[in-house]
C-alpha cells in the first residue's frame, strides 16, 4: 500500500484541496480520491486557527470512519476540541476559538451532527498508526522508540505534545526536547506538531508540519517514495511561529 501523509491542516481547506490535487487526487465526488488507490494519512490538528475547521472534520470523518480509506492520528488541538465537545472545562484560546465560533454559528441540529462525527472520529482513532508491516508510523508530535506498541498515558502525552520538559518559553509555549536526534529505529516516524519552514528529516523521522496556518506551506509526504510535495499557504506569514527546536 502507498500512502500520502498530510501535515497539520488547521482548517486550511483550500490548501488541503490544492495539495491533494497536486498529489493526484480527484475531487469530483466531493472527496479526494486517488486513481491508484493511494491512501491519505493525517498527522492530526485538522482544526483550529484556519477558516474551515468544520468542513475538515466532515471530510476526515467521511474518509476515515465512513469510507475507511484513510488514517487519522489525533493531535493536541484535536484532544482539546474533543474535551470541549464532551462539555469539559477547557480554555477557548490558542486557535480553538475559531472552531468554536464556526460551531456556534450553526443551527443546533448541525451542531449535533458535527459534534457526533468528531467524537466518533476521535474515539475510534488510535494514538498512532503503524503501517506497511511496521515500516511506517504516523503520529502527531513524534514517539520514542521504546514507546512504540504502548498506548498508556505517558505515551499519549508524548504523541500529542512532544517531548515536553515542563518549562516554558517567554511567549508561554512549552520547551520541547529534540527526541528525533535520539531515535535509532528503522521504522519511519512521520509527524507534525512543531512548525518548521522546511520538512525536517532526522534519522528515520520526518516533521512535515510546515506551518500552513502561519503562512508557510501545507506539506505531504509520498510513502514509500519519500517524496515531499508542498503547496503555499494563502494566509499571512507569522515568522515567530517557526521556532528552532531546543
UniProtKB/Swiss-Prot annotation:
Catalysed transformations (reactions)? P(1),P(4)-bis(5'-guanosyl) tetraphosphate + H2O = GMP + GTP + 2 H(+)
Top EC class, one word: hydrolase
Q: Name one GO cellular component term.
A: cytoplasm
Q: Which UniProt keywords apply?
A: Hydrolase, Nickel
**Could you tell me the EC number(s) of this protein?**
3.6.1.17
Q: Which cofactor does it need?
A: Ni(2+)
Cite a single Pfam family from the UniProt record: Metallophos
Q: GO MF annotations for this entry?
A: bis(5'-nucleosyl)-tetraphosphatase (asymmetrical) activity; nickel cation binding; phosphatase activity
- State the superkingdom: Bacteria
Signal peptide positions on this chain = none
Q: Which InterPro entries match?
A: Ap4A_hydrolase, Bis(5'-nucleosyl)-tetraP_PrpE, Calcineurin-like_PHP_ApaH, Metallo-depent_PP-like, MPP_PrpE-like
What this chain does, per the entry, is described as: Asymmetrically hydrolyzes Ap4p to yield AMP and ATP.
- PANTHER family with a match to the protein in the record: BIS(5'-NUCLEOSYL)-TETRAPHOSPHATASE PRPE [ASYMMETRICAL], METALLOPHOSPHOESTERASE
Q: Which family does it belong to?
A: Belongs to the PrpE family.
Record's protein name: Bis(5'-nucleosyl)-tetraphosphatase PrpE [asymmetrical]
Species for this entry? Bacillus cereus (strain AH187)
